């Protein structure tokens, strides 16, 4: 369980654990996911200078923490704190490592060339969005690892449950987007257990790699289930191209009442059927009947936009050994409400995972979280101090 609102009911997990970051491209993916979740408008501007600059800078910091002392301080909170140190201290430290020297050359060129306004803009575009994630509770959950994100590992299978908070959607969504992107990379492999990625209210997070996961994960026994209100939400938050890939690559779709473009898109997806039409004309002498055929929508948009509660339309896909003759449906899904109520009556509250009690039984949660927050700040101060002394000695 990952629960940012209540640390008592949350495990701790470091999404950029050094054991699962083998290359600087992993650091870039993590930085990319975080930045685009914090700045949804950047999804439409990928490749722009002031979009790529903060991603490159944060990726360099993450990879530096991965190679410094074998990843001892490679956590997301440490990366945020290091980013917020003076750039006059951070840049010399990062560029003292050969694998990061070329990575940061655009920043060094601006600094050494006196383009201070440009440099300030590049750095601010990284610092400002990430500063929204400076939170002792967030730092607590993301700074240690009580489990790993390879949920379908045959040696350590697990079910991971995470939840967002509508009041803090922009902040938590960025953190959850990072967890999701790391999970996708780890589970979409051969030789793992069957697994499922189930995401409700998908547009609340930017899920990098979602289109690729849908397209390739089936062969690796990963099922993807996505829930959202309307296709237009997906286009708004993922961009037109990526949204179309997601919409067109899913094999099964279930839809309740939707209107507008979404209803038209679904109607087109369900296809057309040859319909017979009979027309009768009556005059004084006789009655004439004509019959013709015409291709009409199998489920027209007007029917989709007028569905009542419990009525669904959709299509399902089959495979070689399990053929489905009737792939398109328009039906009522019957729910056994009594059974649902009985099941809900047996629900158990999320258990206390960390009770934060000292030897005398006193509640010390606030102090423990604050101590962890301050320790991360001290760690980063010490890293900068030691590294500057090393550089001065060289």
Spans of features found by a protein language model:
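P-loop NTPase motor domains
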Residues: 1-222, 237-238, 302-308, 312-322, ...
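Short, glycine-/Ser/Thr-/acidic-enriched flexible segments
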Residues: 165-168, 204, 229-232, 259-261, ...
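Conserved ATP-driven motor cores of ASCE-family P-loop NTPases powering translocation/secretion/packaging/pilus
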Residues: 214-216, 220-316
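A composition-biased, non-transmembrane "mature-region" signal
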Residues: 331-335
């Amino acid at each position: 369980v990952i629960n940012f609102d209540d640390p008592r009911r949350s495990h701790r997990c470091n999404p950029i654990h050094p054991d699962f970051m083998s290359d600087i491209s992993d650091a870039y993916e993590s930085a990319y996911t975080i930045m685009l979740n914090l700045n949804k408008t950047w999804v439409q501007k990928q490749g722009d200078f002031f979009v790529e600059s903060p991603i490159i800078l944060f990726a360099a910091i993450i990879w530096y923490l991965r190679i410094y002392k074998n990843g001892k301080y490679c956590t997301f909170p440490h990366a945020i704190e290091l980013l917020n140190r003076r750039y006059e201290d951070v840049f010399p430290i990062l560029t003292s490592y050969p694998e990061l020297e070329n990575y940061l050359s655009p920043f060094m060129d601006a600094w050494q060339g006196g383009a201070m306004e440009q440099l300030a803009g590049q750095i601010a575009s990284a610092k400002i969005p990430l500063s929204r994630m400076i939170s002792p509770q967030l730092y607590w959950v993301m700074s240690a690892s009580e489990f790993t994100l390879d949920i379908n590992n045959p040696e350590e299978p697990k079910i991971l449950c995470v939840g967002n908070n509508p009041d803090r959607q922009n902040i938590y969504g960025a953190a959850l987007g990072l967890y999701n992107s790391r999970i996708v990379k780890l589970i979409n492999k051969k030789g793992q257990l069957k697994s499922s990625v189930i995401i409700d209210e998908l547009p609340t997070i930017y899920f990098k790699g979602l289109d690729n996961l849908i397209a390739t994960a089936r062969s690796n026994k990963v099922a993807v289930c996505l829930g959202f209100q309307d296709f237009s939400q997906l286009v708004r938050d993922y961009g037109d191209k990526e949204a179309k890939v997601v919409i067109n690559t899913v094999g099964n779709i279930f839809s309740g009442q939707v209107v507008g473009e979404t209803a038209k898109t679904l109607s087109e997806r369900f296809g057309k059927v040859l319909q017979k039409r009979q027309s009768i004309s009556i005059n004084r002498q006789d009655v004439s009947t004509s019959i013709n055929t015409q291709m009409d929508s199998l489920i027209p948009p007007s029917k989709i936009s007028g569905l009542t509660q419990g009525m669904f339309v959709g299509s399902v896909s089959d495979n070689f050994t399990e053929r489905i003759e009737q792939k398109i449906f328009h039906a009522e899904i019957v729910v056994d409400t009594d059974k649902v109520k009985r099941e809900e009556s047996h629900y158990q509250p999320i258990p206390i995972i960390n009770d934060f009690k000292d030897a005398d039984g006193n509640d010390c949660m606030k102090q423990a979280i604050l101590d962890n927050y301050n320790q991360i700040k001290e760690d980063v101060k010490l890293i900068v101090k030691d590294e500057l002394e090393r550089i001065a000695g060289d």
